[in-house]
Amino acid sequence: MKITRKAHPLLKMINHSFIDLPTPPNISSWWNFGSLLGACLALQILTGLFLAMHYTADTTTAFSSVTHICRDVNYGWLIRYLHANGASMFFICLYLHVARGMYYGSYMFLETWNLGVILLLFVMATAFMGYVLPWGQMSFWGATVITNLLSAIPYIGPTLVEWVWGGFSVDKATLTRFFALHFILPFIITALTMVHLLFLHETGSNNPTGLNSDCDKIPFHPYYSMKDLIGLLLLFFFLLLLVLFFPDILGDPDNYTPANPLNTPPHIKPEWYFLFAYAILRSIPNKLGGVLALLLSILILMIIPFIHLSKQRSMSFRPLSQCLFWTLAANLIILTWIGGQPVEHPYITIGQVASILYFTIILILMPLASLIENKILKW
């Protein structure tokens, strides 16, 4: 008689994806982030669902409803801060997941990689709309500034902005539609994640060497299910540390002031995980140029597989590329810092240099380093 997990139509799919899945024996902890992202997504949907039960998407009561959740709902403060800081953990895992893909050449799985970039864009859109919902000062002005960027699109720009707003400014219609979209998008992300996994399991996982490991595989369970569990425990430890001791450390104090269209905050800035892109946007004086640079800062990930000129897939044995990779990582940290600073000297210059460097490293220096490394291989 066949084992149930191998015979049952539904369990069979789960079995092939998470239990008997042939996995390379040498994948490191950098491969944990996929499962951590799944856990973050589940947490966000669950906490978001409970928040939505008490939240009201109306400009007059939105701010009060969030206060009500924190003060009057049983463990409402915990749910709210798990959701807010869970988003930060989500983005930390996302960026590390993408960095792992860049370092070990996982972008050579084209379908998986491109769908991953689309997922990143969806998650960013969802997080942006979620930031608008508490209807504090930074929510309102952040929404105004970012949606206004659409007006840079030639000819249809101004009409498009009013269409997104549902009026002539960010108001009740905007808040209502953002809430509706913020609620539905995570479910679309879940569906896309399943397709992302489907594509990955067509080719099998990459590994730190970048070599084909078809001849040497081990089952996912119990080896990697246990390994993922340790990663999960660490993630929740840091998340709870954040939620229970420093719940507001990553937030903006301005968001504890109700939205006021007549009073502009001195420094309008998005959440910390968008600051690098915001810095790139601000570093270009031209509005349309800034918007294009902002889009390209993420979409550049889709170009990476086509400018991979190295004979080796992974960076494990490529010291020049490794130096450039870590320079890029440091550059992104600088951009994140600059995005949170006021627009004045010397921050403007630092932001412009860091933005130029960001694109130069990816588009010019990395392919160049690959060619030099190819030459060295022949010596």
UniProtKB/Swiss-Prot annotation:
Binds 2 heme b groups non-covalently. SUPFAM superfamilies: a domain/subunit of cytochrome bc1 complex (Ubiquinol-cytochrome c reductase), Transmembrane di-heme cytochromes. Heme 1 (or BL or b562) is low-potential and absorbs at about 562 nm, and heme 2 (or BH or b566) is high-potential and absorbs at about 566 nm. One of its GO terms (biological process) is mitochondrial electron transport, ubiquinol to cytochrome c. A ubiquinone binds at residue 201. It comes from Thryonomys swinderianus. GO terms for molecular function: metal ion binding; ubiquinol-cytochrome-c reductase activity. Heme b b562 binds at residues 83, 182. CDD domains: cytochrome_b_C, Cytochrome_b_N. The cytochrome bc1 complex contains 11 subunits: 3 respiratory subunits (MT-CYB, CYC1 and UQCRFS1), 2 core proteins (UQCRC1 and UQCRC2) and 6 low-molecular weight proteins (UQCRH/QCR6, UQCRB/QCR7, UQCRQ/QCR8, UQCR10/QCR9, UQCR11/QCR10 and a cleavage product of UQCRFS1). This cytochrome bc1 complex then forms a dimer. Pfam families: Cytochrom_B_C, Cytochrome_B. This is Cytochrome b. InterPro entries: Cyt_b/b6_C (IPR005798), Cyt_b/b6_C_sf (IPR036150), Cyt_b/b6_N (IPR005797), Cytb/b6-like_sf (IPR027387), Cytochrome_b (IPR030689), Cytochrome_b_C_euk/bac (IPR048260), Cytochrome_b_N_euk/bac (IPR048259), Di-haem_cyt_TM (IPR016174). Belongs to the cytochrome b family. Component of the ubiquinol-cytochrome c reductase complex (complex III or cytochrome b-c1 complex) that is part of the mitochondrial respiratory chain. The b-c1 complex mediates electron transfer from ubiquinol to cytochrome c. Contributes to the generation of a proton gradient across the mitochondrial membrane that is then used for ATP synthesis.
